[in-house]
Amino acid sequence: MNLLLVSKGFYTVYAVAKSREHCELLEFLGGVDQTLQKDSDRMLALLGRVAMEGPPRNTEISHQIKGKLFEFIQGRLRVLWFYDERRLIICTGGFVKKGRKTPRREIDHAFRLMDDYFEDKKKAQIQIYGEEGV
């Protein structure tokens, strides 16, 4: 699995990436329409704050979805994520929430990526982009 460094501080925030140039989360946040641009900017700022301070305890900004899966919230934008040891936060992707419930396919996709991450971690097959020396 490939990870791209999003922000680093007391916590380290990564996003799942297909390659150094292709990160679903950053492409999503950079490609939202004009009406959601402020929310996208706020989400990127939130990810920076999370790296410095840890995930917010305010459930209007971050809360548990199911099991070990959480979501960050900014307006209608959502970013799903999970923890790993040593204060790592792995973001699996983002989407625009259109209804009351988080879409099942987004949750399933995030759980698949989480399973892949921990499986690849056991095999020492995690490639990290964006850190010095990589």
Language model features: what each stretch is:
Residues 1-76, 86-89, 96-134:
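Basic, Lys/Arg-enriched alpha-helical interface segments
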